């Protein structure tokens, strides 16, 4: 089937608090396989004179396609923001084209409650799975298992065109143990969960009729001893990995920023952004 005749689908996977230098040194199998079908970019977050390297800030930037000085999420606890003007990329896609089926699976408070700037994911996310990590003894270590199970099942059997899956164990590991062996073990578990999602997608009976773009990113890095929020290079480092599962040839941008994830997803889904969206990113896929 010709590429333009295939139904486009997008999966964005978020790993919280993953340092790009650590990830590149480990070169986990699943994320490396995605990169081999596209590209792996190192990205840099704004300095602290713009916004701290915090979870809510990073994910708001990724999901809206605008920088913190525009969406004005400037901390995890902030209730003042402009997300009503800059909704998430799934909501944008759904509002532009209601035939696009959207799905998200997460367990962080900012996605499923009104904590701080939440919920960062808006009403255009038509299927939402959220587990409250506060009710599980292991926190993200427990809920990531449930999130990955839900994503594997839905991605393999249901018709979701634009999906976002968030996994948070890596951030918890860095906070508790610093950037070391325990952190790397958590990254390896996230990569195994990614592999299961990709395997489920490939096993879809309609896979040959679909064009799947998979992207991965993180909201911030960590200091060596664990912790973030300041402006060190360790905390400001991030990454974007993107690849087409069917191996279709594509021309990719040479440089990337985290605000480019949203317009890349829209471009693959054939959603034309309105000028009123004021998106600050550009598609990483050449037209």
Write out the residue ranges for each language-model feature:
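Feature captures the catalytic ectodomains and active-site-proximal regions of enzymes
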Residues: 1-287
């Amino acid at each position: 089937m010709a590429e333009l005749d295939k139904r486009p689908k997008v999966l964005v996977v978020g790993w919280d608090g993953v340092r790009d230098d650590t990830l590149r040194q480990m070169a986990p199998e699943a994320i490396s396989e995605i990169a081999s079908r596209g590209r792996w970019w190192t990205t840099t977050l704004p300095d602290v004179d713009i916004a701290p390297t915090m979870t809510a800030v990073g994910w708001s930037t990724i999901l809206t396609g605008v920088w913190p000085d525009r969406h004005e999420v400037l901390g995890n606890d902030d209730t003042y923001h402009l997300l009503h003007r800059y909704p998430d990329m799934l909501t944008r896609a759904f509002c532009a084209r209601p035939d696009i089926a959207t799905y998200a699976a997460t367990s962080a408070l900012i996605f499923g409650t009104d904590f701080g700037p939440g919920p960062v994911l808006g009403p255009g996310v038509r299927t939402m799975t959220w587990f409250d990590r506060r009710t599980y003894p292991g926190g993200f270590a427990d809920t990531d298992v449930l999130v990955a199970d839900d994503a594997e099942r839905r991605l393999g059997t249901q018709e979701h065109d634009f999906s976002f899956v968030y996994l948070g164990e890596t951030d918890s590991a860095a906070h508790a143990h610093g950037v070391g062996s325990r952190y790397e073990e958590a990254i390896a578990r996230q990569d195994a969960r990614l592999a299961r999602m990709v395997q489920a997608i490939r096993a879809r009976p309609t896979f040959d009729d679909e064009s799947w773009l998979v992207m991965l990113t993180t909201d911030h890095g960590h200091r060596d001893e664990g912790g973030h929020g300041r402006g060190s290079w360790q905390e400001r480092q991030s990454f974007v990995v993107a690849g087409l599962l069917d191996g279709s040839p594509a021309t990719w941008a040479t440089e990337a920023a985290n605000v480019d994830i949203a317009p890349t997803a829209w471009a693959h889904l054939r959603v034309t952004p309105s000028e009123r969206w004021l998106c600050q990113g550009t598609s990483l896929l050449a037209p």
